[in-house]
C-alpha cells in the first residue's frame, strides 16, 4: 500500500522506497491519474489517500474537486480508501474528504505526543494544530481553522512576496514593493539558503528557471527594477524583508496556539522544518523520529490505514 496526499499544487506519495513529490497543479490540465498509475505499474496494490487539492480554482466547488481526485485515484486503485474530516476512512467521494490531510497527521502524531502540537509548513500553507482535545478538531473546515489560527496561509514556495512584506531598505532608502506577482516565497527562501533545488518544486512566477540569479532577478522586479539597478545586495534585502515577515507571522501563530493549548512539544514537518524548528524551539520530525516530514500527511494516512489491517 502507498500513502497519497493530493494538494492543489503538489502530489506527495510515500511508498517503501521513501517520499516522492510531484509538481502537479490541479488548476491546469492535470496528469494526476497518470502519475498515480505509475505506482500501480511499479507494484503497489492499494492506496490510502488524503487531499486538499479540491479547493483549486479549476473546480466549480469542493464537491467537483473531490470527485475529480477520487476518480483519478480509483482508475489505478479501485479499492483505495480516503481519510475524512470525520476521522474515518471512506471508499466513495463525499464532502468529508475536503482538506482532511492535516487531520490525518494529527491523528497519527497524537498517539506518541498526546500533549504536543504540530507545525507542518510546506509549499503553500502552515498547519498549526495542538493535539489536545482531538474530538474538537473533527469536522473543522479550513475556514474554521483560519478563524482559530490553526491554518496560516503562507508557505515556503508559493506565497507572493508582496502579500506579507510591503517594503525593504535598498541603498539606504525605504523602498515600497509593487503588488505584482513578480516574486514568490520560493525565490526569497532559495536566495537565503532555506531551500535548495530539490525543494523548489513549484512553478516560478515568470516561468523561468530556478537558480540564484533567476531568483534575484524576480526579487528585483518587486521594486520595479532590473537586478543590475539594485544589485545583489538590494535583491537580498527584499528576500530578507519577506522572510522576516513570514517567520514572524508563523512563529506568532505557533506561540499563541501553544500557550492556549498548554502544549509541551512542537513537532515540525514540511519542507520548512529545517528553517522553522529552531525558531519555535521545536523538534524536526525527520531527524527526531524518522517520519517523512516533507510528506507528513501521506505518511500519516498510510500508517493509519495499516493500523486497520
Describe these PLM feature segments.
Residues 122:
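Glycine-rich, mobile lid/loop segments that gate access to catalytic sites or pores
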Residues 1-119, 129-309:
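Nucleotide/phosphate-binding catalytic cleft detector across ATP-hydrolyzing
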Residues 126:
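Glycine-rich GHKL/ HATPase_c ATP-binding element in histidine kinases
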Amino acid at each position: 500500500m502507498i500513502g497519497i496526499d493530493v494538494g492543489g499544487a503538489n502530489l506527495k506519495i510515500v511508498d517503501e522506497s521513501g517520499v516522492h513529490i510531484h509538481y502537479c497543479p490541479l488548476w491546469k490540465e492535470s496528469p494526476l491519474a497518470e502519475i498515480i498509475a505509475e505506482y500501480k505499474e511499479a507494484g503497489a496494490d492499494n492506496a490510502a489517500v488524503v487531499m486538499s487539492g479540491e479547493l483549486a480554482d479549476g473546480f466549480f466547488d469542493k464537491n467537483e474537486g473531490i470527485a475529480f481526485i477520487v476518480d483519478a485515484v480509483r482508475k489505478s486503485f479501485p479499492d483505495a480508501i480516503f481519510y475524512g474530516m470525520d476521522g474515518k476512512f471512506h471508499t466513495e467521494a463525499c464532502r468529508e474528504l475536503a482538506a482532511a490531510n492535516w487531520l490525518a497527521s494529527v491523528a497519527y502524531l497524537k498517539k506518541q505526543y498526546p500533549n504536543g502540537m504540530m507545525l507542518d509548513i510546506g509549499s503553500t500553507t502552515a498547519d498549526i494544530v495542538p493535539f489536545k482535545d482531538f474530538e474538537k478538531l473533527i469536522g473543522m473546515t479550513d475556514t474554521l481553522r483560519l478563524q482559530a489560527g490553526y491554518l496560516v496561509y503562507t508557505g515556503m514556495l508559493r506565497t507572493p512576496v508582496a502579500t506579507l512584506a510591503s517594503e525593504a531598505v535598498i541603498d539606504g532608502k525605504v523602498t515600497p514593493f509593487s503588488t505584482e506577482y513578480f516574486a514568490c516565497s520560493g525565490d526569497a527562501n532559495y536566495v537565503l539558503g532555506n531551500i535548495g533545488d530539490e525543494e523548489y518544486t513549484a512553478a516560478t512566477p515568470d516561468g523561468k528557471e530556478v537558480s540564484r540569479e533567476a531568483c534575484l532577478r524576480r526579487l528585483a522586479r518587486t521594486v520595479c527594477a532590473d537586478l543590475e539597478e539594485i544589485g545583489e545586495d538590494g535583491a537580498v534585502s527584499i528576500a530578507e524583508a519577506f522572510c522576516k515577515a513570514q517567520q514572524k507571522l508563523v512563529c506568532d501563530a505557533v506561540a499563541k496556539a501553544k500557550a492556549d493549548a498548554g502544549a509541551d512539544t512542537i513537532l515540525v514537518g514540511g519542507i520548512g522544518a529545517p528553517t522553522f524548528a529552531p525558531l519555535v524551539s521545536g523538534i524536526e520530525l525527520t531527524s527526531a523520529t524518522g517520519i517523512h516530514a516533507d510528506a507528513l500527511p501521506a505518511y500519516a494516512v498510510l500508517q493509519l490505514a495499516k493500523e486497520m489491517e
